[in-house]
């Protein structure tokens, strides 16, 4: 598959270009642009700047920002909003909202990889009212209805 072009603008000279850590990586790493190390106390939320803005290739694409799995499981450093959604028409700085769900403080170093940026297609839906919805095996069952 040919890579799609995502333009980026450097807003801070210390910013690092998003980079894929391995040839099979689905997301590129985003790095923190900080003046000094940033210590995040347990349950504290912070907004981490990246020093970058991007231009997605069209209205049918989105950039999704995810936590790095190692930071999440080892230190409890997660996305404060679960997943960041960067719309195709946004041109501001990419910032990473993070929360420390761990029991100990975690210090983010300047230049540290703090999140992952995944570019994905978007389907624009035409929402149509309906009196009835089609039947499925699952039906209205939710929240554990399909078993463990």
State where each predicted segment sits.
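DUTPase catalytic domain/fold
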Residues: 1-148
């Amino acid at each position: 598959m040919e890579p799609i072009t995502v333009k980026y603008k450097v807003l801070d000279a210390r910013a690092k270009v998003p980079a894929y850590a391995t040839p099979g990586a689905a997301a590129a790493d985003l790095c923190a642009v900080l003046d000094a190390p940033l210590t995040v106390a347990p349950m504290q939320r912070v907004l981490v700047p990246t020093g970058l803005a991007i231009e997605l290739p069209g209205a049918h694409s989105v950039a999704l920002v995810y936590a790095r799995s190692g930071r999440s499981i080892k230190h409890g450093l997660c996305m404060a909003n679960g997943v960041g959604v960067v719309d195709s028409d946004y041109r501001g700085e990419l910032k990473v909202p993070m929360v420390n769900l761990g029991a100990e403080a975690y210090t983010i170093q300047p230049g540290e990889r703090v999140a992952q940026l995944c570019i994905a297609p978007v389907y624009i839906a035409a929402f149509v009212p309906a009196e009835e919805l089609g039947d499925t095996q699952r039906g209205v069952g939710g929240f554990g209805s399909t078993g463990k």
